[in-house]
Design a protein with these regions (language model features):
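Binding-site signature for planar aromatic cofactors or substrates
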Residues: 12-242
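Intrinsically disordered, low-complexity segments enriched in serine/proline and basic residues
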Residues: 1-4, 9-11
Length: 242
């Protein structure tokens, strides 16, 4: 059986269970994507998924979720461009660096970083975003938040949200904020979340020191330079000096 809309290259070779009794209207009102509903139907997990949707998935941030986010120092994010090409990234800051504005809205800052702005560039084309908060230290639990993003300049957002957190480094303001309109919020179970402890390392907020930022840890620059040393320059090739 091939996945709907595929070219036939993705096949789920299991026996399909009897068609669901759900109507098109029922399917339309279920949380989640059409693709996940299809896989649930094929693998026979629709009832199990519906229990999770019913018991754990909200379209807003309840008080427990808001308090949880306010304690977090790490955030994993996922975005995709107009073609659906994906990018995952990581953000970190002191507790409260992700600011819950209200039950349906949160925001986190975007700094210059390496200057690429892959996540910001993606959401200009495709505003959907997935956030993952994982508490490794205290609760050993996770929180998914999915929604739509608007990029907002720092000064403009501060004029409307007066309790927005101050910069992590004095004098270094965010260039912009990712303002997320929450569409889904739900638990990530603790079953395989390890218990970690902080060792008091210097976070080096805002540093431009390449070594403190990790330098060329994976050797990508070294690899490029080695390749260039062993490749003839365009000028040499054009003049025949090889």
């Amino acid at each position: 059986m091939t996945e709907p809309g595929s070219t036939g290259s993705v096949t789920i070779s299991v026996h399909r269970r009897k068609p669901s009794s759900m109507t098109q209207s029922d399917q339309h009102h279920r949380p989640g994507s059409e693709g996940e509903h299809y896989v649930q139907e094929v693998l026979g997990t629709t009832d199990r998924a519906d229990r999770f949707y019913r018991d754990q998935m909200l379209d807003h941030l309840n008080p427990a979720m808001r308090e949880f986010i306010a304690r977090q120092e790490m955030l994993f994010i996922a975005t995709a461009d107009l073609k659906g090409e994906c990018d995952s990234s990581f953000r970190a800051g002191p507790p409260g660096f992700v600011h819950v504005i209200d039950d349906h809205t949160l925001a986190y800052p975007e700094y210059r970083g390496n200057g690429v702005f892959a996540s910001a560039g993606n959401v200009i084309q495709n505003p959907h975003i997935g956030l993952m908060f994982l508490d490794f230290q205290r609760e050993r639990i996770g929180l998914h938040v999915n929604g739509r993003v608007k990029l907002t300049e720092d000064e403009r957002l501060r004029s409307h949200v007066t309790d927005l957190p101050l910069p992590q480094v004095p004098g270094q303001r965010a260039l912009m904020w990712m303002v997320v309109q929450v569409e889904e919020a739900y638990i990530h179970c603790r079953k395989h979340i390890p218990h970690l402890r902080k060792v008091g390392a210097d976070e080096s907020w805002g540093t431009d020191d390449m070594m403190r930022k990790g330098g060329d840890f994976f050797g990508a620059k070294q690899e490029r330079e080695a390749r260039e040393r062993h490749s003839p320059s365009p000028t040499a090739a054009a003049t025949g000096w090889l």
